[in-house]
Curated annotation (Swiss-Prot):
Chemical reaction(s) catalysed: adenosine(1518)/adenosine(1519) in 16S rRNA + 4 S-adenosyl-L-methionine = N(6)-dimethyladenosine(1518)/N(6)-dimethyladenosine(1519) in 16S rRNA + 4 S-adenosyl-L-homocysteine + 4 H(+)
Gene, per the UniProt record: rsmA
UniProt name for this protein: Ribosomal RNA small subunit methyltransferase A
N-terminal signal peptide: none
Purpose of the protein: Specifically dimethylates two adjacent adenosines (A1518 and A1519) in the loop of a conserved hairpin near the 3'-end of 16S rRNA in the 30S particle. May play a critical role in biogenesis of 30S subunits.
Source organism (scientific name): Rhodococcus opacus (strain B4)
């Protein structure tokens, strides 16, 4: 038998999932995708290979995967990285994932650790080791909160490549001045450089979602241009939230509640070198950091 005829699992590689395998596993495990958990399972091997390649992860990486589901992306990651830590909120899927990996990638099974937890609330103490990269098909209904939470809680994360709803991907990667630039854009940029990294069609999912998907890459700043400790992050995020809560108003008016009064907001804006007549959508992350650092 030639190498081409030997099943991938027998060669120490993962046997990736296709449409038939995904449906068979779902039936075997009694899994019915739920909108509540934002579950849409990828069933295309080429798509998961592309995600892993775009993430740029390798043997030196410990990858954090959120919402591994039936294991499509997990198997592709195990082929190329040192370790995968999969965080799964669904207890049934969390229990079944090691079984799938043992069956389809027996030589790679020891690289997988499954954590049964809510990624939006998971604590560093629950994550074994220090993950260097986040690679995930994030549940669309909580994608941004999960992304920001993990970058806040896990300073070891150097990069992220996530699949999210296309509209969310556009907002995360938007630049100041854009109509879609907003809270997700600025907060993501607080941690690192953000860019769109590709598009993913609906046909590669089961069940087929009603929306298109997109890939977003975030590379954490190697040398942060501002303090990224929890206290400063909370201060900066509070200003961002206030500025966009009344998007159409000038910052002098929009930040009146945050600063105590419109007059005090104007004083602090001027101290930060920002025209009081500006609007939040024109400010980059650096401007919000300067504003948060002004003194009442």
């Amino acid at each position: 038998m030639s190498d081409a005829e030997v099943p991938p699992a027998a060669r120490g590689q993962a046997a990736l999932l296709g449409p038939a395998e995904v449906r068979a596993l779902a039936e075997e495990f009694g899994v019915r995708p739920t909108k509540q958990l934002g579950q849409n399972f990828v069933h295309d091997a080429n798509t998961v290979r592309r995600i892993v390649a775009t993430a740029g992860v390798g043997r030196e990486d410990t990858v954090l995967e959120v919402g591994p589901g039936l294991g499509s992306l997990t198997l592709a990651l195990l082929d190329v990285v040192d370790r995968v830590i999969a965080v799964e909120i669904d207890p049934n899927l969390a229990a079944r994932l090691p079984v799938t990996v043992a069956d389809r990638a027996p030589d790679l099974a020891d690289r997988l650790t499954v954590v049964g937890a809510d990624a939006m609330r998971v604590k560093p103490s629950e994550i074994p080791g220090e993950p260097t990269a986040l690679v995930a098909n994030l549940p669309y209904n909580v994608a941004v909160p999960v992304l920001l939470h993990l970058f806040s809680e896990l300073p070891s994360l150097r990069t992220a490549l996530v699949m999210v709803q296309a509209e969310v991907a556009d907002r995360l990667a938007a630049s100041p001045g854009s109509k879609i630039y907003g809270v997700p854009s600025v907060k993501a940029n607080f941690f690192g450089a953000v860019r769109r990294a590709g598009a993913v069609g609906r046909a590669v999912f089961w069940p087929v979602p009603k929306v298109e998907s997109g890939l977003v890459r975030i590379d954490r700043y190697a040398e942060p241009p501002w303090p990224v400790d929890d206290e400063n992050r909370r201060r900066v995020f509070a200003v961002i939230d206030a500025a966009f809560a009344q998007r159409r108003k000038t910052l002098r008016a929009a930040l009146g509640g945050w600063a105590g009064s419109p007059a005090e907001a104007e004083r602090r804006l001027l101290e930060a070198g920002i025209p009081p007549s500006s609007r939040g959508e024109t400010l980059d992350a650096a401007a919000f950091v300067r504003l948060a650092a002004t003194h009442p």
